[in-house]
């Protein structure tokens, strides 16, 4: 598969077979659920969880409802070169362009085992109204610089609750997949509640 030129790193495929892990089914279930939540589907995003070799993340340029066992990738290492980083993977496709963000967070927070990053104007709006901390940055999407800024903000907030990356999305961390999912669901429910109020529904 040709590599997306917009991805800010090079993918080095150690193995072309898709990764195998018991938690993949759980991630796929959440991809479908978050995409189809009420009347406000989250169209895109990237979900990951830590493994013994690194972490498994959804593939590049995928709608959440299109993620399958063949389009998740295990990131096993990152090497920062002179031009751009190289990410060493097991799988059939390149990892999400935010793979560096996930990698830096996992390195900074050993207790974190799952990351949900959802991109949708509606979910950002709902998160902002909820008073969730935010970061407004001009750093390129998927860059090492952005990843470090986000990790630093999580550190300053004692790694509690989700975080908004303005004009991009909402990121939630969890010690488990369920914990990251629960934080995301809470924002989605607030979004749904807001829609009902605006439309006059109860």
Question: What spans do the regions from the language model cover?
Answer:
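Glycine-rich flexible loops
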Residues: 1-202
